Swiss-Prot record:
Function: Usually encoded in the trnK tRNA gene intron. Probably assists in splicing its own and other chloroplast group II introns.
InterPro entries, alphabetized: Domain_X (IPR024937), Maturase_MatK (IPR002866), Maturase_MatK_N (IPR024942)
Protein name, per record: Maturase K
GO CC term (a single one): chloroplast
Major localisation: plastid
Amino acid sequence: MDEFHRYGKEDSSWQQCFLYPLFFQEDLYAISHDHYLDGSSSSEPMEHLSSNDQFSFLTVKRLIGQIRQQNHSIVLFVNCDPNPLVDRKKSSYSESVLEGLTLVLEVPFSIRSKYSVEGMNEWKSFRSIHSIFPFLEDKFPHSNYVSDTRIPYSIHPEILVRTFRRWIGDAPSLHPLRSILYEYRNSSESLQRSIIVVPKVNTRFFLFLWNNYVYECESILVSLLKRSSHSRSLSHGSFPQRTHFHRKIKNIFLFSRRNSFQSIWSLKDPNIHYVRYGERSIIAIKGTHLLVKKYRYYLPIFRQCYFHLWNEPYRVCFHQLSKNCSSSLGYFLRVRMKPLLVKTKMLDELFIADLITDEFDPIVPIVPIIGLLSREKFCDISGRPISKLSWTSLTDDDILDRFDRIWRNIFHYYSGSFGRDGLYRIKYILSLSCAKTLACKHKSTIRVVRKELGPELFKKSFSKERELDSPPFSSKAAARSQRERIWHSDIPQINPLAHSWQKIQDLKIENLFDQ
């Protein structure tokens, strides 16, 4: 890859003319086969991995020969593995060819993204998903409207090919990609004309498609804003291995659908803040209600014009922070007024001023968490703990570890909220459900289980709470920690309840507008 970068600096046209011959290099598929084995070693059983030891490059040569033939170009999703032990849907040969195609297409994409990032002086490379909560705490108090929407992920295969065609001059190299996308669409159970580009399966090909799709969406949007506003404060960058972006847009011009290159009204005073995490994006706006209505109209039109995506208008919904709470990231997000006393001393006089500031106040959704726990059979719909019958076949240590992990993740995730008193109700449900599960396993009662295990029943379980909630500092530091938020860097990945709750909220919005 370093040689590609060096040659790319010397001759930019060389980057776009060498891709197609790489498809017929055997060394490329040897590398991709190793990547396939490394990626599947943790998920596939050992008998499947042993069959991959008989991987034959003669079969790969035959596949390359079929790719050369126009009538047999769609062969990548056909089982070519002679070993019947390997599942037809997980053919190592097809996966190796697919990995090889991805490696070739990643070369110009990585070069292009590297050069685009190097030219942005204002771009902060440390911005990632870990900066989402500090971003909300910093920007929400200065915004009055917020929107949390899901990025459209169903797109026609030809649109994906056109996104590659914009920056790859080697047109023949896109023919295998087009064949793969259309064959994948035809092989799916649904009869829709579009495919799902969101990486639900952790494969290199779909991760690359998703990164390129998101990069193209956001780069075109920001470039249009630059072209219209001529503002030097706008910055944009991309990281193929980081799918999370953070940028601030100060001055923008919005366009009409008929004439997208002539500004019809300009916005100088409002501020628009944008951040993306995973498959969703948050837009915080400081402006008038008219601005929000126009932006709500502009965003679906932009996606429809440039990517032929029909984005339902109800999916772009803005909430007013001063009146309503916005559900996002597993929180109820709101902004509340906070009184502030300021004392200023000038010479012998003391001035006291009472100020009112806006403060970001995330609320822990206790009732939705209890509802999700009831769906997972930890309690009933009213919050009464019940035994987890599916875990009675596990050992006592495994049961305690699983309950401990659930509580630690929940408490860790909501550690940035001031009002955490409701979390102790969640702790009560989990602790009593753990005791009932152990009692059901040993065919006894909760009293007998506590009497037999004694204080060691919950000695290990729920132990991380004291480490997080009571830092070993002085009394002043402990009192200050109660007034300050502590956002832990690993919280976006450890709470699946937040993702489940967000899906339920999206379904409620869809059902509301369908009625």
